[in-house]
Each structure stands twice: as C-alpha cells, then as structure tokens.
Amino acid sequence: MTARAWASWRSSALLLLLVPGYFPLSHPMTVAGPVGGSLSVQCRYEKEHRTLNKFWCRPPQILRCDKIVETKGSAGKRNGRVSIRDSPANLSFTVTLENLTEEDAGTYWCGVDTPWLRDFHDPIVEVEVSVFPAGTTTASSPQSSMGTSGPPTKLPVHTWPSVTRKDSPEPSPHPGSLFSNVRFLLLVLLELPLLLSMLGAVLWVNRPQRSSRSRQNWPKGENQ
C-alpha cells in the first residue's frame, strides 16, 4: 500500500469517527394541547451556547433530524404554525405550536446547533407532544400540562431541564432513545470493517519486508 493510499484510508476513518449526531441528554418530557389550540415549550441552555443557533426538530430518520424551525441570532423565526424565539438574557428559547392538529403529536427535539468541529454532537432535550380532542380535559402532571387556544403570549410555558452535556441518571426507554442507539450501532458497524481492513493492509505490507530482510541475512555459503 502506497503512502497516498494509506493517507486516503486514514482520512476515511477520521471522517467516520467525526460524523456528527444527536444524543438525548435526559428522559423525554411530555406536554399536551387540544386540537385547534396552541402550546409553548421553553428550553434552557448553558451560558456557552448563548450565541449559537437554537432549533426545534422532529427525528423521523436515523442519522438526521428534520429541523422545523431554527433561530438566527436573537430574532424570532416562524415556519407555518411553528415559531421560535431565543432569549439569551434568560439562557432559554421558546417554541410555540399554534392551531394544533392530531398529526402534530409525537416526539420532538429542542437543541443547540453546535459547530461540528468543536462538538461531536448537538445537545438536545426530547419533548413528547400529545394532542387531544377539543373540549376534553387531561390531568396535569409535573411532566405534562394542557395548552390553551388563546394567544401565544398568554400560553402557559413548559420549562424543561437545561440543555446540558450531563446524562440523566435514570433514562427511560423511548423511541427517541432507540434512534440514538441505532445511530451508535450503525456508526460502529461502519467503522469496524474499515479499521480491520486498515490493520490487515498494514500487516500485509510489512510481511514481504520481513521476508526480504531475512533473505539478505542468509550466509553466503548457503547460496552457493
């Protein structure tokens, strides 16, 4: 294997090792709202993430999260019925879902878009959104409460734990966590064959070199 080929193999390995991903840092929180109503979610983050973009996304795929709306600085952004606004002074950002439909129910992530060269994954918090028929009531709990159909500015704000890099001590099984496990296993399966191939290539290159050196060290009498 030439030096150029070896460099190509090494670069490929590094690219696989640096593939950015998303990893849940706490067990999911739940919030509920009525069909046709609205709800708001407030996600907190660390001081070091104050100047970074914040996003709200839905994770239907394995290696990527479809961002629904993302901040650009402190200015608010809107995408259809979903809006987001960052409050750097409070180290939090608020996501508002309006005119809820049954299709809005599911798992979402609120997270911080970190530079992938500095951080290998974006810190996120999982949020489970439930939508119930209008006119019905649900019992509120520490991890869930009802939205309202009033203006967004009067909505109760649901505050989740800070978006940090500390793992929750007691994570609970959830589809979002299963996505992360699948991503991790997929990355391992992609990297392992490459590393084994690189190791085999190194051993194969070194084998003829040792053989040629041993021939050079044979006594001259044996060649005659």
UniProtKB/Swiss-Prot annotation:
Residues 205-224 are cytoplasmic. Keywords: Cell membrane, Disulfide bond, Glycoprotein, Immunity, Membrane, Receptor, Signal, Transmembrane, Transmembrane helix. Residues 22-130 form the Ig-like V-type domain. It comes from the Eukaryota. It comes from Homo sapiens (Human). InterPro entries: CD300_family_receptors (IPR050671), Ig-like_dom (IPR007110), Ig-like_dom_sf (IPR036179), Ig-like_fold (IPR013783), Ig_sub (IPR003599), Ig_V-set (IPR013106). Glycans are attached at N90, N99. It is a single-pass type I membrane protein. GO terms for cellular component: plasma membrane. Belongs to the CD300 family. The keyword Disulfide bond applies. Residues 21-183 are extracellular. Pfam families: V-set. The gene is CD300C. This is CMRF35-like molecule 6. The lineage of its organism: Eukaryota, Metazoa, Chordata, Craniata, Vertebrata. Disulfide bonds join C43-C110, C57-C65. Residues 136-151 have a biased composition (Polar residues). Residues 1-20 form the signal peptide. Present on the surface of monocytes, neutrophils, a proportion of peripheral blood T- and B-lymphocytes and lymphocytic cell lines. GO terms for biological process: cellular defense response; immune system process; regulation of innate immune response; signal transduction. One of its GO terms (molecular function) is transmembrane signaling receptor activity.
